[in-house]
Amino acid sequence: MERRIFIRLRHRVLAHPGDIITVGDAAQIEGQLQLKKKLSAMPLYQVSEKDKNIVILDIIQVLRAIHLQDPTIDVQTVGGAETIVEIQYRKRNLSTVLFIGVWLLLFIGSCLAIMNFHEDVSMRDVHIALYEIITGERNDYPYLLQIPYSIGLGLGMIVFFNHIFKKRLNEEPSPLEVEMFNYQLDLDQYVAMHENQETIKDLHDR
């Protein structure tokens, strides 16, 4: 009977304190059906509150657990060498007052940022000059340009961020989502390197 299995560690596992993570939770397994079921239910790690927020499970830990159970299994690994276990705790209910306060702070801050930018580049003078070029008349309040410009500014931000509140305009990720994705990749790489004690060896500890 073929006793070879293929394992690919998942990138991220979400768990709660007290959860027991099995090999099937931490990795995708492919191989003979009975062997696959047996390994999927094999305990690998128990999450506790002392683990705080992040635990790194290394492929060596998985191989060690499998071979302790059955040394005759031929394990072939595919993909990454670590999986990140993110420990989630019960979230506190968000205060309505705090939510409104933060929302107002962000709203006023973003409004001031836009206003200061337009003041720095003298956007009002630009609109006055454009109005005079187009119509041949000077108007210190060129609302004919300022109103469409303001509407276009708002629509442009909606298109740029690809969202209207929670509704996505299309499947294409926004620049902000791409930047957040790249940041998350860098953060995961940092955590995998610094939280995994197996990657660090001090020769003076021998």
Swiss-Prot record:
Residues annotated as transmembrane: 97-117, 141-161
Q: What keywords would UniProt list here? A: Cell membrane, Membrane, Sporulation, Transmembrane, Transmembrane helix
- Give one Pfam family, short name only: SporV_AA
| InterPro entries the record matches | SporV_AA, SporV_AA_N_sf
Q: How does it sit in the membrane?
A: Multi-pass membrane protein
Instruction: Write out the GO cellular component annotations.
Output: plasma membrane
Instruction: Give the chief site where it resides.
Output: membrane
Q: Which domain of life is it from?
A: Bacteria
Q: Does the keyword Cell membrane apply?
A: yes
A GO BP annotation = sporulation resulting in formation of a cellular spore
Locations listed in the record: Cell membrane
Listed name of the protein:
Stage V sporulation protein AA
